[in-house]
Regions:
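ATP/NTP phosphate-donor binding region
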Residues: 1-50
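Short Gly/Thr/Asp-enriched flexible loops that form oxyanion-binding sites at enzyme active sites
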Residues: 10, 38-40, 59-72, 105-106
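Alpha-helix C-terminal capping segments
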Residues: 45, 63-71, 86, 217, ...
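Alpha-helix N-cap/loop-to-helix initiation residues
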Residues: 2-3, 32, 59, 101, ...
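A glycine/threonine-rich phosphate-anchoring loop and its flanking beta-alpha core
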Residues: 69-171
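Glycine/serine-rich anion-binding loops at beta->alpha junctions
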Residues: 48-64, 97-103, 237
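Active-site segments that bind and position negatively charged phosphate/pyrophosphate groups
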Residues: 161, 165-244
Length: 244
């Protein structure tokens, strides 16, 4: 974001409104618990009132974990292993730069504990972002590989809600089928033409709709494939989520 001008645009806009900013960089793919803990220390020290996540799923999920951890007097990892439930979180906003995880509209937060090599997530509406700014032009520079990984993640979020045997209903299935068809068509376009606005816009919307609850309405979800992938990228953190 510092090479494409987005960083400067954001900072100048915030400065123009008199908003003080504290930065936290260093987010990696398969976001790490150690950075979450550093972020919690930072937001407490600086008395941060809101978190603006600029990036993709790793940045957003890190922000969600920090937002919950701000109010926790215990190890924030306990949220991810389901020993504690978050009851309060700092407000979160998003400026999205890649179409993939759908974290910009989801209630999901997945973090990797690099010491134990465990990758685990929790779902709670308290971490659903208040807003997401979604400009498809910000994804024009995303590589073919990362675009492909994103497409796989979007499709798996949808398929794991579609291929269930409890609570299926015609409208929900139609949502899934329409989204999958649109993603496959848009994917073929943007792989060959990364700057195709309509294709990128379709993927960006599909990323959000695949994981905001719409495609799973009324059905029971297990997310077995995602759990298998978490084992892979938890052990080998160089594996991109979509590739895993």
């Amino acid at each position: 974001i510092k090479t494409n001008g987005l960083y400067d645009k954001i900072m100048s806009s915030l400065k123009a409104e008199g908003i003080e900013v504290v930065e936290l960089g260093g987010v990696e793919s398969n976001p790490k618990l150690s950075l979450v803990k550093s972020g919690i220390e930072l937001v407490r020290k600086e008395k941060v009132e809101m978190i603006l996540a600029v990036g993709g799923g790793s940045v957003i999920d890190s922000s969600k974990a920090i937002a919950c951890g701000y109010y926790a007097d215990f190890d924030p990892w306990l949220f991810n292993i389901h020993e504690k439930n978050p009851t309060k979180a700092l407000p979160i906003g998003v400026i999205l730069t890649i179409s993939a995880a759908g974290s910009e509209l989801s209630n999901s937060c997945v973090i990797t504990n690099e010491e134990t090599k465990v990758k685990s997530g929790f779902n709670n509406d308290i971490v659903r972002p208040l807003f997401s700014i979604m400009d498809p032009t910000l994804t024009f520079s995303v590589s073919k590989f990362q675009t492909g990984c994103g497409i796989v993640d979007i499709m798996m979020h949808t398929l794991e809600r579609y291929l269930v045997d409890e609570g299926r209903n015609e409208l929900q299935l139609s949502f899934c089928e329409g989204l999958l068809h649109s993603v496959m068509e848009a994917g073929k376009v943007v792989i060959n033409n990364p700057s195709d606005y309509e294709g990128r816009a379709t993927l960006m919307l599909a990323s959000s709709f695949s994981h905001n609850g719409l495609t799973g309405i009324g059905s029971k979800m297990y997310f077995t494939v995602h759990k298998i992938e978490h084992e892979i990228s938890g052990m080998f953190d160089y594996v991109a989520h979509g590739a895993g």
